[in-house]
């Protein structure tokens, strides 16, 4: 254990999330193309930053985006390591305070327990350990935001299902409001530091739903790539104090059993990696559909997959899709009684309901109202348009739904946080590459409407 780090301190630091991954990073120099400083905060130990060779001092600096209390810094050195270096923290990128220093670096991974508050963290090398430069596979900073009023996760901590409601760690019934991504295989460029800063700070969202399609060019085409993307997005949501819903976005194959093997593999890794976090929820089956996909099929799938997650993450809420496009069975001629009479035999779970206001009228609204008095419900997707995610907005019907959700403290997530051409995407086409996400100038009509409702003060 590095000098100054105690066993007790290491346990405390481990409770804080990784807050540096994907953040803006700069360096004093770069040895060559492909070794840029961003490679040291990309979550991969196969890419690295390297400074110019033969020059002291050199530094690498990460901008956490807002003031944080920093409790841990982990440095994974390449062969070109620092013999002497300092870890420093700053409120403004100009005035620096040392939180760790050593003159006996040996090139091993340095896992440092530190204590400091600031927006910027810098590793400042003063003596190279080799004739080369300085090179890091990863620079990981762990901590928590200290923004005024606290983040949703700071306010609520580990969520749990209490009776038929979602509650925070204090036992208070709460409602989360936020946005769903579009498919990350198509619109991953809409999920970056600037857009998620806007979602957390300008929109004041509580939750980000990370929609990873399985087919349609998604997970099945490259499981490693898409799993790593989800890891990264969980870290980015965590760094901003938002909850993250990991959405297993099955669609074309409406039977969840079709992808059960893939789901076991994916959720095992996600739960293993993130089980120490307090902000992760697992949505294990987006919109089961098809005449042969009965509630019994979905329930059996849940009974097989939930233990896979619980083996590694015993505390996070798990969200179970419902029959006929997560409509509680309404789109297939049923209703909530099929679940009430035969619920999933597991604790700390909720059932999902999706609606699109221009397509789903009073039958859906009434079913939701009844179901919410008997079952724990989470609306993990809704739109103000038709079920295609396009067409005219029905804001009047949408408001009826949102009024009911507020009354019954049902959490909701809107579809979708992208610049897709359809009316359901909140940004106008071309917004994401240009990076202008705050305010309303680049929002469609539906985007302005839902942003206003997400920004309404939370009752935490």
What residues fall within each predicted segment?
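N-terminal carbohydrate-binding accessory modules
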Residues: 14-16, 146-207, 220, 456
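Short beta-strand elements bearing conserved aromatic residues within extracellular beta-rich modules
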Residues: 85-87
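Exposed aromatic-hydrophobic patches
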Residues: 108-114
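Aromatic-lined substrate-binding rim segments of carbohydrate-active enzymes
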Residues: 192-253, 260-265, 310-312, 397-408
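Short beta-strand-plus-loop segments that form exposed binding edges in beta-rich domains
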Residues: 124-132
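Extracellular glycoside hydrolase catalytic/binding regions
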Residues: 183, 188, 260-281, 285-419, ...
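Short, conserved beta-strand segments of beta-strand-rich sandwich/propeller modules, principally
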Residues: 72, 120-122
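Disordered, acidic Ser/Thr/Pro-rich linker "stalks" and the adjacent N-terminal cap
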Residues: 8-66, 76-82, 91, 101-107, ...
């Amino acid at each position: 254990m590095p000098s100054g780090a105690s066993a007790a301190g290491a346990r405390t630091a481990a409770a804080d999330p990784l807050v540096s991954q994907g953040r803006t990073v700069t360096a004093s120099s770069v040895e060559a193309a492909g070794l840029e400083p961003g490679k040291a905060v990309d979550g991969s130990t196969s890419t690295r930053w390297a400074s110019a060779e033969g020059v002291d001092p050199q530094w690498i600096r990460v901008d956490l985006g807002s003031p944080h209390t920093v409790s841990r810094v982990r440095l994974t050195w390449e062969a070109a390591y620092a013999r002497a270096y300092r870890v420093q923290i700053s409120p403004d990128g100009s005035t620096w305070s040392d939180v760790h220093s050593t003159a006996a670096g040996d090139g091993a991974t340095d896992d440092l327990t530190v204590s400091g508050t600031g927006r910027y963290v810098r590793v400042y090398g003063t003596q190279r350990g080799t004739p080369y430069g300085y090179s890091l596979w990863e620079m990981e900073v762990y901590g928590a935001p200290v923004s005024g009023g606290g983040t949703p996760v700071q306010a609520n901590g580990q969520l749990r299902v209490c009776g038929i409601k979602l509650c925070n760690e204090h036992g208070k019934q709460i409602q989360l409001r936020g946005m769903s991504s579009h498919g990350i295989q198509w619109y991953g460029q809409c999920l970056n530091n600037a857009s998620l800063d806007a979602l957390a700070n300008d929109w004041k969202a509580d939750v980000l739903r990370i929609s990873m399609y399985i087919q349609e060019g998604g997970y099945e085409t490259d499981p490693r790539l898409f799993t790593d993307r989800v890891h990264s997005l969980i870290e980015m949501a965590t760094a901003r104090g938002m909850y993250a819903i990991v959405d297993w976005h099955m669609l074309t194959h409406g039977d969840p059993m079709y992808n059960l093997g893939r789901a076991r593999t994916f959720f095992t890794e996600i739960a293993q990696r993130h089980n120490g976090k307090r902000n992760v929820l697992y949505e294990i089956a987006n919109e089961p559909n098809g005449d042969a996909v009965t509630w019994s099929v979905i329930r059996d799938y849940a009974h097989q997959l939930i233990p896979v997650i619980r083996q590694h993450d015993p505390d996070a809420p798990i969200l179970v899709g419902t029959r006929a496009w997560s409509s509680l069975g309404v789109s297939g001629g049923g209703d909530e009684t099929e679940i009430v009479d035969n619920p999933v035999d597991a604790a700390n779970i909720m059932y999902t309901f999706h609606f699109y206001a221009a397509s789903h009228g009073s039958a859906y609204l009434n079913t939701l109202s009844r179901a919410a008095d008997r079952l724990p419900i989470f609306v993990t997707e809704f739109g103000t348009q038709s079920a295609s995610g396009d067409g005219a907005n029905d804001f009047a019907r949408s408001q009826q739904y949102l009024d009911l959700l507020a009354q019954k403290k049902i959490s909701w997530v809107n579809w979708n946080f992208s610049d897709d051409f359809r009316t359901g995407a909140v940004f106008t086409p071309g917004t994401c590459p240009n990076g202008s996400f705050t305010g309303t100038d680049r929002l469609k009509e539906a985007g302005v409407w839902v942003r206003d409702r997400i920004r309404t003060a939370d009752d935490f």
